[in-house]
Amino acid sequence: MKTAPITPGRLAFSPDGVPLAPEFGDVYHPAAGALQQAHHVFLGGNRLPARWGGRGRFVILETGFGLGNNFLATWDAWQRDPQRCERLVFVSIEKHPLTREDLARAHAASPLPELARALVSAWPLSTPNLHPIAFEGGRVQLLLGFGDVALLLPQLVVSVDAFFLDGFAPARNPEMWEPRRLQRLGRLAAPGATAATWSAARVVRDGLSAAGFTVETTAGTGGKRDITVARFTPRHIAVPPPGGWHAHDAASREALVIGAGLAGCAAAWALSQQGWQCQLLDRAAEPADVTSGNPAGLFHGSFHRDDGPHARTLRAAALATERLAGAWIAQGRVSGQLAGCLRLESRWSDDAARAAMAAQQIAPGYIDWMDRAVASTLSGLALPSGAWFYPGGGWLAPRDYARELLARSGSLFRGGIDVATIERHSGLWRVLDEQRQVIAEAPVLVLANGLGANGLLASGRGEVPWPLTAVRGQISSLATDGHPATLPCPRLPVAGGGYVLPQTGGRLLFGATSQPDDIDPALRDADHRFNLQQLAGLSGCDVEAWSSLPWQGRVGWRAVTSDRLPLIGAVPDLEALDRTSRADQPRFVPRQRDARGGLYVFTGLGSRGITWAALGGQLLASWISGAPCPLEADLRDALDPARYALPRWRSDS
């Protein structure tokens, strides 16, 4: 999907205080009030809250978030309902999101002040992607999609129980209500889905009918004579693609996760947000004790001229990390700093960088360009070039982060467990030791043990469909005590041909080497000298002054894929792939089902484990639980482990 620049909405008010959208020449809601319309049209028209009573999860899709009044009214109704669903998921698309300041102005006199303040506080940057936001400890989940409905509707991976068709009038915003847009709703509708809109225009009713809905009009409100309500009654039930976009059909919501590093702990946390219970097994005695045990690491997004899959997925991942870990850093639960990150870039001139940003109209709160002088002042180092500045980036202690994820998940951790093989038995996945004694079993198994995932996968099913390379990395640190005047201690992380972090715990941490297929666990002087040279390149300082200082280091191995993107999702069924007639995209590749279903992988995070963890866990949880996917469909494909099976199908087809 090619993203389009986001133009923020403008907010004005009529003389009697009704909020207006000047670009559309229309009101955000009628003078009678937004909540009255929300209750009569959208909640009442979808027979809510009655329909969500007793449900494990209820999903609403809204076309046009606007001021967020429909979401607030729905959240309030959920809070007040003693029979409420276990989890409420509200997905909403908005082409012109307001700034946080305008959203706060719009809700200055909200009749739901606490909920409105929570929404304003959580309001994301106006970047062109999906933004998952959790309230009520994860029991109310808002998934905001900023962009054109024409681009985002085909990219949603979601099963919708109720549609709130909002937006400005068809006469003023015809693209929103085009029949082909409305017809796409049928692809997303769950059995028994309903829809409601304040518009009774013929084009709206015909579009819903063509999408498989039975349409009728009923009494309106707020000056509207009629409104439209509809029930999904398709003539034919669509068969999901063979790759399966749906949840694993498990009788109990229990999962085994092998590996208790960042990936495994994030998987457990995200699954707990969907009501799943996990048991984590790890060879180490404590969680996050191997590669995720580095004392500190940095995180930030990415920027490319074409805004392709790498840039888009890393942007979404960095924003998710900032939202989750940033709060824990502020609370003192995770050691770290959320004060931005600089990434040096000598290939860009100042003019070219600013022109690329202007072309994408990227939100300044996500990225900015700083020339050499400004970047040097910000960092406190004499930098050799200009740099991209990521305001939401920073550094944290990955062990703290992983253990906080694990603690919040409520999962059982079992350390000192050496899993030798895996097998499927009587509808459950079993993990076994060297003596083939059963260690644990569950209907769902997640391989989140880095490089060890391939060996276990081979033990349980034979062929491994993807390459995974072990890349050795050695980091270095120097004591800052007694050397503050000579060591280049930045005020914030600086990266680009290596990295250096602000001093913490009396030490300066920098690195790192990148050595594929090097299995030497010993610290090496040559690698420390290499890290010093990288530090010199970042800081403009002479390394000779530090080469004789005592140093410490740590060695770990990153699991890296050939395309530098993680492997997150259901393991493909290669035998079924050989028999399928269509597998031109990862989503169509068959998965393990029935006797061999319930096998998932979360590995290949490379050197960006901190950045990938939160979003990767949420993506994995959506695969397993059937919750709305936090990424667009093409980005889900880009991280799908089945992408490596496509050449096999093409060669056989």
Swiss-Prot record:
<dbReference type="InterPro" id="IPR047785">
    <property type="entry name" value="tRNA_MNMC2"/>
</dbReference>
<dbReference type="InterPro" id="IPR017610">
    <property type="entry name" value="tRNA_S-uridine_synth_MnmC_C"/>
</dbReference>
<keyword id="KW-0560">Oxidoreductase</keyword>
<keyword id="KW-0949">S-adenosyl-L-methionine</keyword>
<dbReference type="InterPro" id="IPR036188">
    <property type="entry name" value="FAD/NAD-bd_sf"/>
</dbReference>
<dbReference type="GO" id="GO:0005737">
    <property type="term" value="C:cytoplasm"/>
</dbReference>
<dbReference type="InterPro" id="IPR029063">
    <property type="entry name" value="SAM-dependent_MTases_sf"/>
</dbReference>
<comment type="similarity">
    <text>In the C-terminal section; belongs to the DAO family.</text>
</comment>
<dbReference type="Pfam" id="PF05430">
    <property type="entry name" value="Methyltransf_30"/>
</dbReference>
<comment type="similarity">
    <text>In the N-terminal section; belongs to the methyltransferase superfamily. tRNA (mnm(5)s(2)U34)-methyltransferase family.</text>
</comment>
<dbReference type="GO" id="GO:0004808">
    <property type="term" value="F:tRNA (5-methylaminomethyl-2-thiouridylate)(34)-methyltransferase activity"/>
</dbReference>
<keyword id="KW-0285">Flavoprotein</keyword>
<dbReference type="GO" id="GO:0002097">
    <property type="term" value="P:tRNA wobble base modification"/>
</dbReference>
<keyword id="KW-0808">Transferase</keyword>
<keyword id="KW-0819">tRNA processing</keyword>
<dbReference type="GO" id="GO:0016645">
    <property type="term" value="F:oxidoreductase activity, acting on the CH-NH group of donors"/>
</dbReference>
<comment type="function">
    <text>Catalyzes the last two steps in the biosynthesis of 5-methylaminomethyl-2-thiouridine (mnm(5)s(2)U) at the wobble position (U34) in tRNA. Catalyzes the FAD-dependent demodification of cmnm(5)s(2)U34 to nm(5)s(2)U34, followed by the transfer of a methyl group from S-adenosyl-L-methionine to nm(5)s(2)U34, to form mnm(5)s(2)U34.</text>
</comment>
<dbReference type="InterPro" id="IPR006076">
    <property type="entry name" value="FAD-dep_OxRdtase"/>
</dbReference>
<feature type="region of interest" description="FAD-dependent cmnm(5)s(2)U34 oxidoreductase">
    <location>
        <begin position="258"/>
        <end position="653"/>
    </location>
</feature>
<dbReference type="Pfam" id="PF01266">
    <property type="entry name" value="DAO"/>
</dbReference>
<protein>
    <recommendedName>
        <fullName>tRNA 5-methylaminomethyl-2-thiouridine biosynthesis bifunctional protein MnmC</fullName>
        <ecNumber>2.1.1.61</ecNumber>
        <ecNumber>1.5.-.-</ecNumber>
    </recommendedName>
</protein>
<dbReference type="InterPro" id="IPR008471">
    <property type="entry name" value="MnmC-like_methylTransf"/>
</dbReference>
<dbReference type="InterPro" id="IPR023032">
    <property type="entry name" value="tRNA_MAMT_biosynth_bifunc_MnmC"/>
</dbReference>
<keyword id="KW-0963">Cytoplasm</keyword>
<dbReference type="GO" id="GO:0050660">
    <property type="term" value="F:flavin adenine dinucleotide binding"/>
</dbReference>
<keyword id="KW-0489">Methyltransferase</keyword>
<keyword id="KW-0511">Multifunctional enzyme</keyword>
<feature type="region of interest" description="tRNA (mnm(5)s(2)U34)-methyltransferase">
    <location>
        <begin position="1"/>
        <end position="233"/>
    </location>
</feature>
<dbReference type="GO" id="GO:0032259">
    <property type="term" value="P:methylation"/>
</dbReference>
<keyword id="KW-0274">FAD</keyword>
